[in-house]
Design a protein with these regions (language model features):
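N-terminal secretory signal peptides that target proteins for export/translocation
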Residues: 1-7
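Hydrophobic residues within membrane-embedded alpha helices
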Residues: 9-12, 142
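Bacterial N-terminal signal peptides
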Residues: 11-22
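Non-catalytic accessory regions flanking glycosidase/transglycosidase catalytic cores in CAZymes
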Residues: 25-273, 304-348, 355-377
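Active-site His/acidic residue clusters
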Residues: 281-299, 351-353
Length: 377
């Protein structure tokens, strides 16, 4: 069963290696690299190629979703070219809804024939039509052959709301919520492989203190249940708590609080991992271009990603202190690239490494196609 996987088992990992050679070294030595494709190498976990979709720029609307009346070729409103690309990449999982949007998302706005039109205050106050909701997301996953990583609203939502959402998605059609799901077009329960308990709760997810988040984490872990009969014994849903957000000292306190709670967990609640986010910042203002950026800018971006190793070691040490046997949780170390290579295509490029839960990479194309990748380490 999945719950037996140890903390240190990385669900996914993006490896970015930067070699800095001085001009004199290049002149003095000739570097030769040989790759023997005939020999088997290390096994790479498929979850490294996971994706992450956020309601930001054209990442969802026009990027994944164009609607049934669009001139762009689509299947039930989902772009065929995006599906073909992600199927070719063999994407294993997609996290949604992501980013600050996740803690202001109310799932009932995105189901049924009549959708509530709201605003997205995190990204310019743009109109959120909610035409891409639960069923559209799950249809998207089915089309590309990926598993669901659902992030529930802890910041402005309630445990009751999150519990209802999971029941709506996963229960057999013996309950009222499951019958509503069936009436909306999907009779069989959905499979939810991963559950995120909030997003960056130390910042836009609610500006919570460590102790307050821990109290919420326990409640959500207890009452947000997966009812899918196929996931009761095997393929059980994994629950990820919000982890640290970089190298600031306050995130040591945060990780200590979450891991101390994990060490003392009882039969009634549990978590399976932490999600660590770290922003690769070259410059917040005057972001680099998505396309046509300079080689020196790309080198700066790669250099910044190397700090992830130190963060993984720092927070792994804290995890080891409270879970020395590495029994039942993993660190999702997410390297989020805020170089903003994707600003020019309304989304940007975000690179995330997740040691214990997810990695995020947003990819932009000239056609305003915005996608993100969410991988597990």
């Amino acid at each position: 069963m999945r719950k037996s996987i140890c903390w240190r088992h990385l669900l996914a990992s993006f490896a970015l290696v930067s070699l800095a050679l001085t001009a004199s070294a290049i002149a003095a030595d000739k570097v030769q690299l040989t790759i023997d494709a005939s020999k088997a190498g290390a096994k790479i976990d498929r979850n490294i190629f996971g994706q992450f979709a956020e309601h930001l720029g054209h990442g969802i609307y026009d990027g994944i979703w164009v609607g049934a009346d669009s001139p762009i070729p689509d299947t039930r409103g989902i772009r065929n070219d995006v599906v073909a690309t992600l199927k070719a990449l063999k994407v294993p999982n997609v996290r949604w809804p992501g980013g600050c949007f996740a803690d202001e998302y109310h799932w009932r706005n995105g189901i049924g024939r009549r959708r509530n039109v709201t605003l997205n205050p995190n990204w310019g106050g743009v109109v959120e039509p909610n035409t891409f909701g639960t069923h559209e997301f799950m249809d998207f996953l089915n089309q590309i052959g990926a598993e669901a990583y659902v992030s529930v609203n802890v910041g402005s939502g309630t445990p009751h709301e999150a519990a209802d959402w999971l029941e709506y998605m996963t229960a057999p059609t013996t309950t009222t919520l499951a019958k509503e799901r069936a009436a909306n077009g999907h009779a069989s329960p959905y499979k939810i492989a991963y559950l995120g308990i909030g997003n960056e709760s130390w910042d836009c997810g609610g500006n919570m203190t460590p102790d307050y988040y821990v109290s919420q984490m326990k409640i959500y872990s207890r009452f947000v249940r997966n009812y899918n009969p196929a996931q009761q014994d095997k393929d059980q849903m994994l629950k990820f708590a919000v982890g640290p957000g970089g190298a600031e000292p306050r995130f040591v306190d945060w990780t200590e609080a979450v891991m101390k709670a994990y060490q003392q967990h009882t039969w009634s609640w549990d978590i399976n991992g932490l999600s660590m986010h770290s922003y690769t910042v070259v410059r917040w203002q005057d972001k680099f271009k998505s396309l046509g950026f300079a080689e020196s800018e790309y080198a700066q971006f790669l250099k910044e990603t190397l700090t992830m190793d130190g963060l993984i070691n720092r927070y792994s040490a804290i995890m080891d202190k409270y879970d020395p046997q590495k029994q039942n949780a993993r660190l999702a170390a997410a390297r989020i690239g805020r170089k903003r290579l994707g600003q020019r295509c309304n989304g940007g490029l975000e690179v995330s490494l997740l040691k214990f839960g997810e990695a995020e990479v947003e990819i932009c194309s000239p056609g305003n196609l915005g996608l993100r990748a969410s991988a597990f380490l």
